[in-house]
């Protein structure tokens, strides 16, 4: 695992820039060799962040499909998985977790370099902003890693048992992840490159893909894209 106090070229999904206040956040990358499908890494990491927020700050957070963690409607954390294979053909994954821990949300604005990025300030938050007090990054990291390790080892054990991914560990993670999704049941838009698809987020399948019911009644499977919630 690698931790840093600052990133000069942090990245989110689809090449987006991850911006944070130096010395205030959790910026971590964990090298793993999962024996299970990578989408389960996204699920377990998202749940680890949600659980750690609840334990550390007594704040209820939710997951925005596929891998953002929200408090209310504002993003407080993001997950990024990058995968490859070693020379023996074994899966290698880097699990990146970024959490806005300390600092007031207003502090983020000076680190945004364009009008588009500056507009994102209205959709971000920090744990300190919501909790009202500075949060120990060390305590948060320890709790988060404990949750990641527990779920990761359970999935590794399940994968080597020869009974596939329908056993309790993966099923429990899927069910808990689905239960924390704030996206389901909402009318949303999904931006995919230059195109946009709108409809109601009806469910997710076992692979974590989003099932979107379009206004025509057609149900389409969404494997990637940026989900946008309409203004309330």
What function would you assign to each model-found segment?
Residues 1-9, 13:
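Flexible, acidic active-site loops/lids enriched in D/E/S/T/G that coordinate Mg2+ and/or position polar
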Residues 4, 61-65:
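General beta-strand structural signal in soluble alpha/beta enzymes
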Residues 12-14, 105-106:
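Short glycine-/acidic-enriched loop or helix-start segments at secondary-structure transitions
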Residues 13-37, 41-45:
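DPxDG-like acidic metal-binding loop motif
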Residues 36-37, 43-61, 71-232:
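Long, positively charged amphipathic alpha-helical accessory segments at protein N-termini or as interdomain linkers
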Residues 68:
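Conserved active-site carboxylates
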């Amino acid at each position: 695992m690698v931790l840093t106090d600052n990133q000069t070229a942090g990245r989110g999904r689809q090449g987006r820039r991850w911006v944070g206040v130096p010395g205030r956040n959790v910026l971590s990358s964990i090298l793993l060799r999962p024996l299970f499908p990578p989408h389960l890494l996204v699920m377990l990491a998202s749940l680890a962040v949600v659980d750690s927020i609840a334990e550390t700050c007594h704040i209820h957070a939710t997951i925005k499909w596929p891998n953002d963690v929200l408090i209310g409607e504002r993003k407080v954390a993001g997950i990024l998985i990058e995968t490859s294979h070693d020379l023996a053909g074994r899966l290698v994954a880097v699990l990146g977790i970024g959490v806005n821990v300390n600092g007031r949300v207003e502090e983020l604005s000076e680190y945004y370099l364009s009008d588009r990025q500056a507009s994102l300030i209205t959709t971000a938050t920090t744990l300190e902003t919501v909790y009202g007090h500075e949060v120990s990054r060390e305590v948060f990291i320890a709790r988060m890693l404990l949750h990641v390790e527990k779920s990761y080892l359970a999935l590794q054990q399940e994968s080597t048992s020869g009974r596939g991914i329908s056993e309790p560990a993966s099923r429990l993670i899927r069910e808990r992840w689905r239960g924390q999704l704030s996206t389901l049941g909402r009318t949303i838009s999904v931006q995919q490159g230059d195109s946009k698809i709108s409809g109601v987020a009806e469910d997710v399948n076992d692979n974590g893909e989003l099932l979107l019911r379009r206004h025509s009644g057609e149900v389409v499977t969404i494997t990637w894209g940026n989900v946008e919630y309409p203004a309330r």
